[in-house]
Structures are given as C-alpha cells and as structure tokens.
C-alpha cells in the first residue's frame, strides 16, 4: 500500500472578476497574434488602499524580462486569466529531470479534472538521500484558472510574502458544486544512490524507466509494481508519499567513463536505448564523431535506425546505426555549446536545437546537403537553453525553457499583421502595446520558477506542459494554446 503523509497544496486566492470582464479579456487573447503572458506591475505600500479613480486609463505594457527593470517596491503579478490551468508543487529536493508516463486514461483528454502520471529523479544534498519518484497527480482542475503557490516541504521559507496574506487561503479551493480543486499528489519513492541527471520512460512500456546518475551509471528499472500500487490507490482527498524503497534495477551499465545527460528510448523500436557522455560512447556499440562531450540525443520519429546528437563542439550529427561508426551527416548548428535538441514527431524533417548562448534554431533536414539547413533562428532568451520540445499536437508549436527563468511557447506559423492589429486596437478599449522587437512567433511566456531545467508536453492532454526547476514543478495549460488533437488525415 501507499502510505499517506500530509503534503497539501493550497490554491492561491484570486481577485474575482465579472464574467463580462473575463470574456472581454479572453477575446483579446484569442484575437491577438502575439500572446505573451501579461505581467502586471504592483506597487505595494502598507496602509495605502488602491484606487483606480486616481490612475489615468493607459494601455497595458508588456514587461520584458532582461529588458525592463522593476523599480524598488514593484513586483511582477501573475495574470491567472492567461491560463486554463496552473498548479505548482514541490517534492523536497529539486529534480533535474522527469518524464511524463503514458497511461490508459484516454488519448485526447480535454475535460477537467485531469489525472496524470510521471517519474522524476532528485538532486539531493547527499548521495544516499536521492530517490526516483513515481507520481500520480489527480484532481488537476482548470477552467477557474486557479494558481497554486510553491509548497516548501523542507526549510524555513514561508509560502508567500506577508504582504500577500490577504491573497492566501488556508482551506481548499472549492468549485461551484463544492468539490475541491486542489490537486492530489501521491508518490512512490525508490532509493537511488547519487543525483539523477536524466530519466526517461520507454514510450511503448512506460513502466520501464532508465536513469543516468552523476556517478556515470546508467540503470534500467521496472517500475510496474509501484505504478500498479498508485493506480489502485484511492486518493480520498489526501496527498501521500512512501518512504524510499529498495528496488534492484534490471540493468546496471557502467561502461561510461564519466557522467552525462544524453539518453533516449527509440519511439519506433521497443527496448532500443541510446546513451552518450563526455567521452561519447553509446551502449553497446561505441560511436565516434564529435570533438567534445555529447549533450543530448534524439531518435528519429520516422526512421527506426536513425538518430541525432548534439555537442559542446557546436555541431549536430545524424547517424544511421546500420552504416559504420561515424555520422552520416554533421553540420555546424550554433556558435556555442548545443545543449538540447528535439525532433518534430509531426513533421520529421524539422529538428530544433537550443544553445548555451540562449539562442535556439529550427533546421530543415531535407536541405542539409545543399547548405545551411537553418530555417529559423531566435535570440530571445538571455541565458542558456535548458530544454526544448515540439508539441505532439501542433507541428508548428514548440516550448523552450531557459536559465533566464522563462518558459516560452512559440508558433512558427504566426506572422505579424500590422493591419489586423491596428483594427483590433481601434475596436478594443483595453489593449496591450506590443514591443516592436518582440518576435511575432512568440505565443506565450510563463514565469515564476527559478532555474528551469526541463519541460515536457503531455501527449494525451493537449495543451498541457509540465516543467521542473530548482524550486519545484509547475503544471500549466496556457489559455491560448489549442487543446484539441490535429486532424492527421487532413
């Protein structure tokens, strides 16, 4: 059985708006081509009441991280109307990596509340304190666009500033029918010696997971017993976690000379696994081709024997495991370390890459031999790109996380339409002045997490993204992201 411990998430109390105001703002978000998250400025002074009558009516201005500065006494305020759903939680120690587990609850789930499963590995202060966590997160509510603040399990940090006490709630949020909208989190923990640099679940058999430890060991685990226990457990409105259980891995590979991060299961061939480290070796056949450490690997979604790798040497290499031990193609992708890559599952000719200088690029693999395959390049982020992933539901949409504490969502099909914007601005009393240098493909900006490490789209819940950072996890569903599956037959 899963033992239960109290680790309750408390939703943040929000200022309620009238239905007319919400509908007006919703229409504004849907019509605009550029929809970054609105960040409101709030100058808080104790003892002073706010008065809208004394403030002249002015257009809202988009606040740009790394460009605009906050004055003393100012802070950014989350706009909950920008989300269909937003929740946050902390598991004690930070998690560098996680993966969303496929389930049997349905392929196209759009109705709240949602239930999801995931696996994550910790980065604890001492090696014996680390573990792999199997998560069942249920009652993930939405539509009210409720925000859940960070929950601190260890330490003396307060959940909220004392100035925000009037916005907190000590009781569960309830929907109109009286049901709780607080997510319920249950965790089964497996002891893992050392920090987990990267963890991935096999797409065909999600109970089979592989972890890469900072010790250099790659271990394959069968987590079926723990997932079955979570699936059969009754939440009854309670969060819960188990003590770290001893569980022997199926395989313990120690062939790498040092630690690494690059690891990937094949989506086409069950059980086929790639791993690469600073010494660039792949189990079980060593391959050579990069002049520096390999940072990420991705199997092709369309060809069972082809994969891509990226490296600190600034290159991306394409490999065919049937042909020799050197890359079939290699090209210069960035002028800095290439940290992450993502292969588009809906348009397999497109590969995205993110670099250490904050830039990310889109490469068309059909034209590599003809010259520069780069079809798009963005320098919006100010710090290294830490994660990048194409949407499983929209071929032109991808999400990016960076060390600048931003998670951004991009739609490459968008173009700036000045005539449409001018017409919209003339018809709308409340509008946002868009910075001229803001890329028209930037669809959404999510902030509020510190030192973002990794993000993933949920393949079975369109529009849902989960991200991990130094201060915990966020589950978000932006309001302007399509929440239906594409018509693949079209």
Where in this protein do the model-derived segments appear?
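Repeat-based blade/solenoid architectures
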Residues: 32, 88-101, 190-196, 297, ...
